[in-house]
């Protein structure tokens, strides 16, 4: 299951994402976050990725938000508010 999820995200990154302009407000991007979350936390990582996508909208400043070591659906407490520092 984990491999299928990873292949799905990589296919999105290669074939679908290039069709639209970059719009993610976070570093790493939401799709890269999803990949890392799945690699670290298995199928629960998909929930983390979905929560991250729901947080990524024009009304947030964004910033550096790495995948936490422990499973959590909340934004990383160590998140930098300034994405340009990444």
UniProtKB/Swiss-Prot annotation:
Gene Ontology CC terms, in alphabetical order: plasma membrane
Organism superkingdom: Bacteria
UniProt keywords, alphabetically: Cell membrane, Membrane
Record's subcellular location: Cell membrane
DNA repair in keyword set: no
Broad class of the protein's primary localization: membrane
Membrane topology qualifier: Peripheral membrane protein
Alphabetical list of SMART domains matching this protein: Haemolytic
Family annotation (Pfam families): YidD
PANTHER family (UniProt xref): MEMBRANE PROTEIN INSERTION EFFICIENCY FACTOR-RELATED (PTHR33383:SF1)
Protein function: Could be involved in insertion of integral membrane proteins into the membrane.
Family, per entry: Belongs to the UPF0161 family.
NCBIfam families in the record: membrane protein insertion efficiency factor YidD
Protein's UniProt name: Putative membrane protein insertion efficiency factor
Species of origin: Streptococcus pyogenes serotype M1
């Amino acid at each position: 299951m984990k491999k299928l999820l990873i292949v799905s995200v990589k296919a999105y990154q290669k074939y679908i994402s290039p069709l639209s302009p970059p719009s993610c407000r976070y570093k790493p991007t939401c799709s890269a976050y999803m990949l890392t979350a799945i690699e670290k936390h298995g199928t629960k990582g998909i929930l983390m990725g979905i929560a991250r996508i729901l947080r990524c909208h024009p009304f947030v400043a964004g910033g550096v938000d790495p995948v936490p070591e422990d499973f959590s659906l909340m934004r990383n407490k160590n998140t930098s508010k300034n994405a340009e520092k990444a």
